[in-house]
């Protein structure tokens, strides 16, 4: 969405990004390993899983412990999502692949080179998940915050803001309503 919003094709008047993957949390060593493994993508092994999915060919989705999840602090919504996946297993993502990691790091590295203060031409709301373990909240704010057209709402949330507790979601929706009505 961020790529589209700053492109010449953009027809949106405003944009809301919710814990966007403008950046990812990865240290220098991890980035080097992914770059090296990314060579496997070039020879046809891009679909090789880097993360073992919680999937069993006979039993389907295997429930992960709530305490280990990096997406939400809301147990009820976490468990509801698992029940939904059990009913509709085809909608689940079965692990991160070499190809996905390679291209995610490549794209987020490109985002670091963009002059966001020039690229953003219309109002944008960044819903920032301060407790995010997947994207780099600080870097997202640093990059997108270059523009005066960006409004940043930081929330004490993990990655899936709209799957968080009612209190966090209410705060997010209030920011969205204010942004869209301004």
Cite the ranges covered by each PLM segment.
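Alpha/beta-hydrolase-fold enzymes
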Residues: 4-91
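Hydrophobic/aromatic beta-strand patches that form the interior of the parallel beta-sheet core
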Residues: 16, 125-127, 153
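Short beta-strand/loop motif that positions the catalytic acidic residue
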Residues: 120, 126-128, 132
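Conserved alpha/beta-hydrolase "acid-adjacent" motif
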Residues: 133-139
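C-terminal alpha-helix
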Residues: 175-182
